[in-house]
Amino acid sequence: LWNSAVYGSGYDREWLNRRLIQQGGSITAFEVQCLKKMLDWWENDPATDTQRLGVIGLSYGGMYALHFGALDTRIYATYSSCWFSDRKKHNWCDWTYFNAERTFFDTETASLVFPRRLYIEVADEDEAFPASDGRQERLRLEAYAAKTGNADKLTFKEFKGKHELDLDSDALETFVKDVKGE
């Protein structure tokens, strides 16, 4: 992702997102569509086991993993790290849009992954999205998963750490088992 504060001007993500919203889309929708097209291409590789596809992402990647897993049923397991939170507290332009509060927050997006497997982790000392900011969303998601018979498809973990993947091997081992359907 382009960060003009770091890399200089020449690409204005917010301006591009506003233009896409005016056309009925968003930068997130465009980039998730790019991921879907990448998967279309990858599926044609004979070495790809199309029954064992998973997506994993950290931070912005966690957002894309969650949206991609929600929108593409070819993804069997989704792992989103250090992104799930309360969008009222983290109201950034590329994932909050007009009337968002009446439609989709993180719980609603995550619920679209079901009945496939979903692994979400949050860090207790995350500088960007502290675990405490997303506790209400977590409760909503767990209640939804239980109500719809998908509690066994959800793993939600709060770990000791910062804005990083959980370094405990259980996280990746769980994801690999989920991808394998174990």
Task: For each feature predicted by the language model, list its residue ranges.
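C-terminal catalytic histidine-bearing segment of alpha/beta-hydrolase fold enzymes
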Residues: 145-182
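Primarily recognizes the serine-hydrolase "nucleophile elbow" in alpha/beta-hydrolase
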Residues: 36-109
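Flexible loop/turn segments at secondary-structure boundaries
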Residues: 2-4, 8-9, 62-64, 85-91, ...
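Hydrophobic/aromatic beta-strand patches that form the interior of the parallel beta-sheet core
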Residues: 2, 79, 119-121, 157
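The feature captures the conserved acid-bearing segment of alpha/beta-hydrolase catalytic domains
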Residues: 77, 86-146
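Cap/lid segment of the alpha/beta-hydrolase catalytic domain
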Residues: 1-44, 87-94
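Extracytoplasmic/secreted proteins, especially bacterial periplasmic and envelope-associated proteins
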Residues: 34-37, 64, 108, 136, ...
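Alpha-helix capping and helix-loop boundary segments enriched in small/acidic/polar residues
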Residues: 7, 22-30, 56, 97-104, ...
